Every structure is written in structure tokens, then in C-alpha cells.
């Protein structure tokens, strides 16, 4: 009977776990719907402001704005990595971290050796990972996703711009997971500073941009700027940077909720399978115990008859 109790305890424990994972799946699904609404609204605006900035950049001299080229004295680099504050979301965090580490190994190995590589980690998981490995961390953006707002994007950009203007780093790259659907997230390495020559497009932006990149006649728009391109550029560039980071934060948040929903759904399904297997094992063990008891009773009855 002790074996039966052990099996019963395991079934009860897994049943409790299943209830938790099912609840977490439902919470993630609700958060995902809200995150999707935000990212679907942000993408067109971020694309258009990028298009306009790129158009202005081509119209003007490369020296028209300090963010169009790296400071001459700058030798360092800043990598902004966006992860989650929590786990239980499959490979979401490890995908972003591995992408950042691959970027460092392939592009910034010498920079890291010279101790000129800096990391700005948005999310507890990435911050903890790179802090343990003694990277030079900039800022503190742990726990921002519970109340994610535009101020976070502005502060990240201000930290990145400050080091860029001071010549501490001459490149800023943004690493994050882009939301495609609940199953698929694209790992993105996006150049932020200096503003790239060609407009950067993620796989999802490439797909969605076909609907609004050009007018119906297929020709690029020739803008007329008022009060003038240089004046407009001073206003537009900060907004461009803010919205690229804001979009990346929203993409990552939506991808996180989608990954967590799928992970918790898989965990719930696995728990149900385990419960079925253990229930079958429990019934077999119980049947064996009953059979043994019946055999003991039968043997005892036969022994009494023989002795009588």
C-alpha cells in the first residue's frame, strides 16, 4: 500500500502543477492580446518614421547630424540586449542571449579584449547572465516589463546617446526577439547608432511594409520639407531613435508572452499525459494488491478446510 500512496501523491502533485501551468497559460494569452494590439499599432509608425529619416539622410550631407557617423575618437561598442524579467517561456531568453553572444564573438571580440565593450540589458534575465560574466553593464533596467511604457525607451536611448556623444562607444546594436506569431520569434540584431545608410528592416517589417511603403503608382515619394530638412532632422532623429527602441521593446514583450503561452500549454499537456500514465500505474498496482489479498484469503480458507 505504501507504493500506492507514493503514486497517489505524485498524481496529486502533478495535478497541482497542471493547475498552475494552465492558469499561467491563460494569463499569458491575455497579456499577449494586449501586447499584439500595441505592436500592431507601433509597427507602421516606426516604419514610416524610419522611411522619412532615411529619405532626409540621403538628401543631406553625412555631417548634417552627429548621429549619422561615429565619433572619430570612439573605439568602443554598446550592445543593447532585451530579454524578459521572468523565465518559464521556453527558449525565449536563451535565444536573445545566444544571439548577443554570437554577435560579440563574431564582431566585437577585439573590442571585448580591449575592455571597450559595454552591455545595456533590459530585463532581469539578460542582466543576470552578463553580470555573472563580468561584462561592463550600463544602466539598470530590471523589472521594467510589468509596467512597460514609452519612458523606458526614452531612457534607454538617452543612455545610448550619452556614451555615443562622449565618444565612449562608436556603435550601438540592438538585440531582441521579434514577434512573428505565437510559435515563431525572429532573433534580430539591429544597428541603432550611427543611423545606418540603408533603412534597416526586420523579416516581419519586410513582409508588412509592402502594404504601405510606396504609393499605388510604385514611385518613391518626393517630400517637400517645411521649414527645411536640417531643422526637421533635429526634431525627427530623436523620435526615430525612441520609436525604434520602443518597437523593439514591444516586439520582445509580445514574443515573450507568446513563448510563455506555448511553453505553459506544452507543460499542461505533458502534465496530463503524466497523470494518465500514473493513473494507469496506480490502477495496476491497486489491482495487484487486491489480487494478492484475495489469494491470501483463498489460501487461508483452504488451509482451514484442510486442518478441519
Curated annotation (Swiss-Prot):
Membrane topology annotation: Peripheral membrane protein
PANTHER family, A to Z: ATP SYNTHASE GAMMA CHAIN, ATP SYNTHASE SUBUNIT GAMMA, MITOCHONDRIAL
Protein name per Swiss-Prot or TrEMBL: ATP synthase gamma chain
Keywords linked to the UniProt accession: ATP synthesis, Cell inner membrane, Cell membrane, CF(1), Hydrogen ion transport, Ion transport, Membrane, Transport
Family, as annotated: Belongs to the ATPase gamma chain family.
GO biological process assignments: proton motive force-driven plasma membrane ATP synthesis
Keyword Cell cycle in record: no
Pfam family, one: ATP-synt
Known function: Produces ATP from ADP in the presence of a proton gradient across the membrane. The gamma chain is believed to be important in regulating ATPase activity and the flow of protons through the CF(0) complex.
NCBIfam families cross-referenced by the UniProt entry: ATPsyn_F1gamma (TIGR01146)
rRNA-binding recorded as keyword: no
Gene Ontology MF annotations: ATP binding; proton-transporting ATP synthase activity, rotational mechanism
A Gene Ontology term for the protein's cellular component: plasma membrane
Gene name linked to the record: atpG
Subunit structure: F-type ATPases have 2 components, CF(1) - the catalytic core - and CF(0) - the membrane proton channel. CF(1) has five subunits: alpha(3), beta(3), gamma(1), delta(1), epsilon(1). CF(0) has three main subunits: a, b and c.
Main location: membrane
InterPro entries the record matches: ATP_synth_F1_ATPase_gsu (IPR035968), ATP_synth_F1_gsu (IPR000131), ATP_synth_F1_gsu_CS (IPR023632)
Subcellular location: Cell inner membrane
